[in-house]
Amino acid sequence: MYCNQCQQTAKGVACTTRGVCGKTEDIQSLQEMLIYGLKGIAAYAYHCRVLGKRDEQIDAFVHEALFKTLTNVDFSTEDHWNLIMRSGMINYRAMELLQEANTEFFGDPTPTTVFTGVRKGPGILVTGHDYLDLEALLKQTEGTGVNVYTHGEMLPAHGYPKLRQYKHLVGNYGGAWQKQKTEWAEFGGPVLATTNCVLNPPESYKDRLYTTGITALDNVKHIERDDYSSIIEHAKRIGDLTERQGINIPTGFHHRAVLSLAPQIIDAVKTGKIRHFFLIGGCDGATPGRDYFTQLAEKVPKDCVILTLACGKYRFNDREFGTIEGTGIPRFLDIGQCNDAYSALQIAIALSKAFNVGVNELPLSIVFSWFEQKAVAIAYTLLALGVKNVRMGPTLPAFVSPNNWKYIQENYNWMPIGDVDEDLKAMLGN
């Protein structure tokens, strides 16, 4: 443990074995777990507010949970676990509210394919998660000759009818966040960063990087949504970007789009044409071992469906997965951003109702890649909903103490990722 939040901290530095207050390593871990989950909830609640949505129960829970972590308020292990489970349900509500806001503003996403190259003409790259920022830029660039490209978690924007209607939203350039220093340098045009994940830029593109909204970097230009003229003029000054070849990748498989195929999917499962569903998704990152998710997706049998979400999809979304034989059902379904875990859960819940079984009895395996605190909040949502047998990687969270991880293992049978072939065999029940 490492706790230095009160005046009595050991040696004026930190308590590292047991708190002067009586706090144990496991309580310190539970409080960190709770705080990191709250950060994820805050991100989704912030996006909701930007779109005019708010739920008092979310705000009230954040206040209560933070108060619980104050010095000498709560030393109960059971109470902390209850709070973490409640945080999972609060995050579920935040994701639900954000889904409502996104679809009210931009329409229900529908499946589409997105070009991954660069077209002739000036262009701006938009990264992050904020669709309202993207829409504002699209409105302000309409008729200017400046093309707009999405990056990273903005890819699902192409599925929304209100955003897709802009003809100068021409494609998606680059992959997940950790490659930005190379990809943004190569892109050549200005980049607009709306939320995470943005890194401190090298000189190669620092003068072309703009932040907006909640995002900020030292010595990088910050502009507001109501006036993007400076980045638009910058794109015009740079002029035509270097054309690049690309492929078309799929997105837009919102739960309503997927559930419109429910009769065909149910029939395909009953007739044995679909053997299993794999949800392989979450955050991407630079840590070695993330090629596990690529290998797993590539080795999933052809009679199985892969669902994905968040930037972890970039590990394999450039592959051609085709369709389930004899059905026309796509084998690869990109559900959307990390917050669209809500959509993935709606699909699982609908299937469980259709087959009259619990979610844990479905032919469904969840393989969860994580990086930051929104993924932590989603993990708590899965736990709160009682979802078991989840594989998590590439490493386990350092802030979860051995005893707390043991609790998760014993009660939910969560486990770290292992050998791809052995894991796949176990998930398929072979």
Identify the residue ranges that each predicted region occupies.
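Metallocofactor- and cofactor-centric catalytic cores in central/energy metabolism, strongly enriched
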Residues: M1-L351, N356-W370, A375-A379, V390-N430
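Long, charge-patterned amphipathic alpha-helical coiled-coil/hairpin "stalk" segments used as oligomerization
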Residues: L383-A384
